[in-house]
Swiss-Prot record:
One of its GO terms (molecular function) is metal ion binding. HAMAP family: Coprogen_oxidas. A divalent metal cation binds at H98, H108, H147, H177. This is Oxygen-dependent coproporphyrinogen-III oxidase. Involved in the heme biosynthesis. Catalyzes the aerobic oxidative decarboxylation of propionate groups of rings A and B of coproporphyrinogen-III to yield the vinyl groups in protoporphyrinogen-IX. Its EC number is 1.3.3.3. Pfam families: Coprogen_oxidas. Residues 242-277 are annotated as: Important for dimerization. Its cofactor is a divalent metal cation.
Length: 302
């Protein structure tokens, strides 16, 4: 097995954060990311970057964190009791972009690395991550481009990787209490250690590097699309699903809160404005109803 290199992973993640912020900041053109470096009392720290009230991005957060501790929180050991009592290190980049224009989808991406150690035993390590897209008004060409970019990122590692990670994404980003997917999916993977370290790390890098070419063309294509109050109100309503998922189901949010993470950074993914309407149903045959019938369904996009 190739040797685990925490420093190589950390260097990559810091560089990825830089590249994503540069690309998205350039696409916005009006606002820049504000950096907030922080330390965690129990061990570790990170740097959070937030762009707010831009010309294109209403709120975007790109967070790097590297935290460690004496034992993993319950969210990490629930499915793997053999990890109980091990010290851990966790590092990753996580981002959510909430655009102003309702015709631009929200995007989320995350790549992360965990290692759990115990004296006298081999370290247990794994990678996780992925990216997913949440449109408000769907465009088929955008979703196909998103999934095609995801597929290309996975191809060097085996033809089974894209369909496996796509299905995993569809299953993970699903609001059980609403009986609907959060968006149109993408890739999701966790507990990845089936390859040696170098190959697993290369797969994580390939997926991390694919986020900007997957999202930036969609952002550029839709950011100047005309919209009115109707579209804005529907966007705010659908953002409610994002909030529900992140606070009820998201593993990263739960892990962060259980491990004593930095609350401002953990909740950075939430949109600045959102609304809930009681028992809302879109008008039949409207652009809003099209989202439910054409996009928030299980589909093979490529």
């Amino acid at each position: 097995m190739s040797e685990v290199s925490l420093q190589a992973v950390k260097d990559y993640l810091l560089d990825l954060q830089d590249r994503i912020c540069d690309a998205l900041g350039a696409e916005d053109g009006a606002a820049t990311f504000r950096e907030d470096s922080w330390e965690r009392e129990q061990g570790g720290g990170g740097r959070s970057r937030v762009l707010e009230n831009g010309a294109v991005i209403e709120k975007g957060g790109v967070n790097f964190s590297h935290v460690f501790g004496e034992q993993l929180p319950p969210s990490a050991t629930e499915a793997r009791p053999e990890l109980a009592g091990r010290s851990f290190q966790a590092m990753g980049v996580s981002l959510v972009i909430h655009p102003k224009n309702p015709y631009v989808p929200t995007s989320h991406a995350n790549v992360r690395f965990f290692v759990a150690e115990k004296e006298g035993e081999a370290p247990v390590w794994w990678f996780g991550g992925g990216f997913d897209l949440t449109p408000y008004y769907g465009f088929e060409e955008d979703v196909v481009h998103w999934h095609q970019t995801a597929k290309v990122a996975c191809q060097p590692f085996g033809k089974e990787i894209y369909p496996e990670f796509k299905t995993w994404c569809d299953d993970y980003f699903y609001l059980k209490h609403r009986n609907e997917p959060r968006g149109v999916g993408g890739l999701f993977f966790d507990d990845l250690n089936r390859f040696d370290f170098d190959t697993s790390f290369a797969l994580m890098r390939s997926i991390g590097d694919a986020y900007v070419p997957a999202y930036q063309p969609i952002l550029a294509r839709r950011k100047d699309h005309e919209f009115g109050d109707r579209e804005r109100q529907f966007q705010l309503y659908r953002r409610g699903r994002y909030v529900e998922f992140n606070l009820v189901y998201d593993r990263g949010t739960i892990f962060g809160l259980q491990s004593g993470g930095r609350t401002e950074s953990i909740l950075m993914s939430l949109p600045p404005l959102v609304r809930w309407d009681y028992d809302y149903h879109p008008e039949p045959n409207s652009a809003e109803s099209e989202l439910y019938h054409k996009f928030l369904i299980h589909r093979e996009w490529v």
